[in-house]
Regions:
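Sequence/fold signature of self-assembling virion shell proteins
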Residues: 221, 225-357
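Acidic/histidine-enriched, beta-strand-rich ligand/metal-binding domains
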Residues: 177-213, 219-221, 225-229, 235-239
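Short, Φ-rich (hydrophobic/aromatic) sequence segments
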Residues: 16-17, 190-195, 340
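N-terminal alpha-helical "arm" segments
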Residues: 1-43, 341-357
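Intrinsic-disorder/low-complexity loop/linker signature
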Residues: 50, 142, 151-152, 163, ...
Length: 357
């Protein structure tokens, strides 16, 4: 049995879909739903007030970067192209070729390791847009930016070129105001101040996004504990997660959203998609869209008889290329052209609640 009789781009995409159904969903999709354009030029990606995103060599320090797998051309579309690939090993190929029938019980075993590798490819492609979305929501010192490394140069997609977002929609807490000072800080006051500031601009915040490490500040906070005690006649009370979520919602009209999903960065280290020591006030409804463009595989591979192409989800391209040899070889690629728009960024507010001063 030839490998391309049992393994193709459609089966890889199906396996990845089944694998994804068992994982924590990507929260960013709630505010940046996926959409697709044929092509995709940077001029189509909009920020607040209909302004386009700008791309330039980055002058932002200590910002997590995404590594483009192909050259990023500032003169052309200015869009980063991400591609990862793998080759099915000769040993696996021979094992599958020995199998005579699709009903053979050894077929599933032979394919399992292949699907594990291809699932990792597709999962890696899904990580890219979520990192982008969370970079915008967390900001870098108040600036919504996405950093890309291409050909040894770091570029930044800057969604706040005039600095107006950082001026009006971001605050860095200092001194005893930092939430890490659990005895003196006033997180309920901070959240209400930001919510009311948005409300004066006609924007209604419904949620406050953070991870569990930041949430711990609230569990230990004196203002919150006093607020809980004021609602109870007993001298002592256990402060648990649900109680804190409830009092924050009651006092600020904001629902806490905890997001602890992690990814492995290019250095092999685990990172939170939404970082420590930040909180973002968010509205109901969309903030923008996650735009996917046309990949080179989509444009050209369909014309090649030895290349099989399927779209996974909205915009990730899964392609398999078979070389009949000898020896026979199959290569699998997952690729994407992707960037979020952020038209409703003025509906958000970001606090940096702790920093090393």
């Amino acid at each position: 049995m030839l490998i391309n009789e049992v393994l193709d781009s459609k089966s890889i995409a199906l396996s990845a879909t089944e694998n994804a159904s068992n994982q924590m969903p990507y929260l960013g999709l709630q505010w940046f739903p996926e959409r697709k354009k044929q092509g995709l030029d940077l001029s189509w990606i909009k920020t607040h007030k209909g302004l386009p995103v700008s791309l330039a060599p980055s002058n932002f320090d200590t910002i997590p970067t995404l590594r483009a797998r192909e050259g990023l051309s500032k003169e052309k579309t200015q869009m980063a192209f991400f591609r990862e690939g793998m080759t099915v090993g000769e040993e696996e190929m021979l094992e599958i070729e020995r199998i005579q029938s699709a009903d053979d019980p050894y077929l599933a075993s032979a394919l399992s390791s292949v699907y594990d590798d291809t699932n990792n490819l597709v999962s890696g492609a899904e990580v890219v847009p979520e990192r982008m979305r969370m970079s915008l929501l967390a900001t870098n010192a108040g600036h919504p930016v996405i950093a890309i490394v291409s050909d040894g140069v770091q570029y930044a997609y800057d969604y706040d070129k005039d600095g107006s977002y950082a001026k009006d929609h971001y605050a860095k807490l200092t001194g005893t105001s930092m939430w890490s000072d659990t005895a003196n800080s006033k997180p309920l006051t901070d959240l209400n101040n930001a919510r009311k500031k948005l409300q004066k601009q006609g924007k209604i915040a419904r949620y406050v996004l953070m991870n569990s490490n930041t949430f711990q500040y609230l569990l230990d906070n004196a203002q919150i504990r006093n607020s809980i005690l004021a609602q109870n006649l007993t001298a002592t009370i256990e402060v648990d997660d649900d109680t804190v979520v409830s009092v924050v919602q009651k006092r600020t009209k904001l629902t806490i959203v905890l997001y602890d999903k992690m990814y492995i960065d290019d250095d092999g280290k685990e990172q939170y998609f939404y970082p420590d020591d930040k909180v973002t006030l968010l509205p109901d409804g969309n903030l923008g869209s996650t735009w996917f463009g046309t990949t080179p595989e989509e444009r050209t591979a369909r014309q090649l008889p030895n290349v099989d192409v399927t779209t996974y989800g909205v915009g990730i391209t899964v392609a398999t290329k078979t070389e009949y040899g000898p020896p026979m070889k199959m290569s699998t690629f997952a690729s994407e052209v992707v960037l979020p728009s952020y038209e409703n960024m003025d509906s958000t507010f970001v606090y940096e609640v702790h920093s090393e001063e």
